[in-house]
């Protein structure tokens, strides 16, 4: 197969057309496109609000900032998140800084989702799914000059958003750059009470540049600097003084008649500093900094051979993770502890994807990846601290992981059907393998890593069907993941907790099997040319080897949306909610979330003045000022109460 791809490339001599990835879903960030999802707040919306538009995505919320994406009811450990194909790793042991928090809406063109084991080429360990945040680039041969500015305000929490960017483009070069600023005070929950420590502020600047070396050869570079300060986390015991990311890349592209070849080298550095100095009645003050450094490269070839659309990707990255903690007990000497022992991870992998057109109404998608990684512990103090509990451990480990998936799709008149299956595995994360006394406020236990963990694996089965009748569509889709060696924290009564107030200690371990299943039903009705109605109901289930519920599995959720749209104006009313969480992970420290329902309104109007486009949007969220928390709100911190927002975007 590789020989066929290379032969095709060598025989080609003209510019290729753009290849389109087979994605489960895309949400547009920077511009509206018919048939593609977009947040009602437009580009002023936060990354978290854009992510919430994706069908299989929910978000774990620990405060107003940096929500953790969850795909198919699986959190960060079982997902792959890349930024334009680049691997980036968070630097906080408490997962307070997901990868998505280090970019802004102004940086992005779109966010793409591959559900389950059929990941994007650079994805590794993506049992639940993979997210790729596509950067917004001016590109060659586009508008010679383009500029835009955005401003937004939300009354609840006095959220202020300001952004501006400009772009230059020609046949030989392009450049686009911009800056974004967000600031929020504490917000009020339903009923009017202020939620302390829910404030944040953030600055983001970025630049993308391209140079055409020859007609078919191009260089592209990216620089993003993102800095959040004074970030409150009301669900946790600590806040964040600084979360800072520097993201850089340099890519070379060569185009052929029916193929393209891109090679990108990248480097990023994430710094995260937790802070409890603003909290009242702190028993023991703690400093908890963390750092993540990643350097990597990938090389991607794409081509079309008759009925085949092929993609071959090689990637390699090296990541270092280090975190420590210093405790300052009153009247005693400071106590120092390494929580991530400077773990260096070298990972390399090869992926192949083939989209096959069997007939005009049938297609088959095949994808596979194999990856090898080696991890070394570079901090002697952290290594020897773990070795006390695991005498047989060494300071170096290696794992081999992989995935393979197939999906068949058939379309006949008003019917569409797809079925798929896959198998994949993932290596334990640094926290799961080498974390040292990491306090988890979800269940109030200290967690210990386990270097002897086995790789986790899963078999995925999925299917979807769609029926179109007159002006309506009825869709049903579902998947089930059958896990082996599922990794989760397990009680260890022989160890004593270190954190003040902790219930005890858990050590990560493998359980023989677990199951996560998801099912959704969607109905879309185009009532008239301008009026549409959408209904959706989702059900999920997660069980461990003993048949007990897994934590953070969504209860039944539902949403009903009525939308009016013409060329320049659109408005929508949305009612959404969850049922009471009757099946929850009590065994794992979870408590049940109550049922809730809220009503939102939004509207948007576009107009042109002297060749400049203006977009005004406004909305009312949680109309009845409902006091509620979702199942994914950490420690049931309540959501915002009634909120009014207004945004303005100007494009020249």
List the model feature ranges, each with a label:
Residues 51-87:
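Extracytoplasmic beta-strand/coil segments of soluble accessory domains associated
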Residues 184-187, 192, 196-202, 212-294, ...:
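Flexible loop and strand-edge segments within Gram-negative outer membrane beta-barrel domains
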Residues 203, 210-213, 354-355, 401, ...:
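Conserved C-terminal beta-signal and adjacent last beta-strands/turns
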Residues 236-257, 288-294, 339, 343-345, ...:
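Outer-membrane beta-barrel signature, preferentially recognizing the C-terminal barrel domain
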């Amino acid at each position: 197969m590789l020989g066929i791809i290379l032969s095709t490339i060598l025989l080609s001599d003209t510019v290729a057309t753009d290849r389109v990835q087979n994605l489960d879903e895309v949400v547009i960030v920077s511009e509206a496109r018919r048939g593609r999802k977009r947040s009602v707040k437009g580009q002023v919306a936060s990354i978290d609000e854009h992510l919430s538009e994706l069908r299989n995505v929910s978000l774990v919320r620990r405060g107003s900032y940096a929500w953790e994406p969850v795909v198919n009811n699986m959190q960060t450990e079982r997902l792959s998140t890349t930024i334009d194909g680049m691997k980036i790793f968070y630097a906080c042991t408490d997962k307070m800084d997901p990868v998505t928090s280090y970019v802004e809406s102004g940086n992005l063109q779109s966010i793409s989702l591959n559900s389950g084991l059929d990941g994007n080429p650079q994805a590794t360990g993506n049992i639940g799914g993979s997210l790729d945040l596509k950067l917004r680039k001016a590109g060659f041969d586009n508008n010679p000059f383009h500029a835009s500015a955005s401003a937004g305000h939300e009354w609840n929490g006095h959220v202020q958003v300001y952004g501006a960017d400009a772009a230059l483009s020609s046949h030989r070069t392009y450049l686009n750059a911009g800056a974004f600023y967000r600031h929020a005070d504490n917000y009020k929950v339903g009923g009017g009470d202020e939620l302390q420590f829910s404030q944040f502020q953030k600055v983001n600047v970025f630049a993308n540049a391209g140079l055409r070396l020859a007609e078919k050869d191009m260089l592209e570079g990216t620089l993003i600097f993102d800095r959040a300060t004074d970030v409150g986390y009301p669900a946790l015991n600590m806040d964040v003084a600084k979360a800072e990311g520097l993201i850089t890349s340099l890519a070379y592209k060569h185009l052929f008649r029916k193929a393209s070849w891109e090679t990108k080298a990248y480097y990023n550095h994430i710094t995260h500093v937790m802070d409890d100095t603003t909290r009242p009645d702190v028993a023991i003050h703690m400093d908890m900094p963390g750092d993540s450094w990643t350097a990597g490269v990938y090389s991607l070839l794409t081509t079309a051979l008759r009925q085949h659309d092929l993609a071959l990707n090689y990637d390699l990255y090296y990541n270092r993770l280090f975190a420590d903690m210093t405790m300052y007990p009153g009247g005693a000497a400071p106590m120092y502890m390494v929580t991530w022992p400077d773990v260096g991870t070298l990972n390399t992998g090869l992926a192949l994807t083939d989209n096959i057109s069997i007939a005009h109404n049938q297609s088959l998608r095949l994808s596979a990846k194999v990856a090898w990684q080696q991890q070394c512990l570079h901090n002697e103090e952290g290594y020897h601290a773990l070795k006390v509990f695991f005498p047989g451990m060494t300071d170096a480990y290696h794992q081999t992981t992989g995935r393979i998936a197939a999906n068949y799709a058939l379309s006949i008149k008003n019917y569409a059907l797809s079925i798929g299956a896959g198998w994949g595995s993932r290596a334990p994360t640094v926290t799961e393998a080498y974390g040292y006394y990491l306090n988890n406020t979800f269940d109030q236990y200290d967690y210990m890593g386990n270097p002897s963990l086995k790789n986790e694996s899963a078999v995925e089965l999925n299917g979807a069907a769609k029926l179109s009748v007159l002006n309506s569509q009825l869709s049903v889709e579902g998947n089930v993941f059958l896990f082996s060696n599922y990794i989760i924290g397990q009680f260890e009564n022989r160890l004593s907790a270190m954190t003040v107030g902790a219930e005890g200690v858990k050590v990560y371990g493998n359980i023989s099997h677990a199951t996560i299943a998801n099912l959704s039903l969607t109905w879309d009705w185009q009532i008239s040319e301008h009026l549409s109605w959408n209904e959706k109901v989702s059900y999920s289930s997660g069980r461990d080897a003993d048949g007990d519920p897994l934590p953070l599995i969504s209860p039944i959720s539902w949403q009903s949306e009525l939308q009016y749209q013409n060329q320049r104006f659109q408005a929508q009313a949305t009612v959404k909610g969850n049922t009471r969480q009757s099946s929850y992970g009590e065994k794992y420290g979870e408590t049940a979330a109550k049922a809730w329902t809220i009503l939102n309104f939004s509207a948007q109007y576009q107009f042109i003045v002297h060749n400049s486009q203006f977009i005004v949007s406004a909305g009312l969220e949680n109309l009845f000022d409902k006091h509620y928390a979702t199942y994914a709100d950490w420690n049931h911190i309540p959501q915002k109460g009634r909120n009014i927002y207004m945004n303005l975007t100007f494009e020249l």
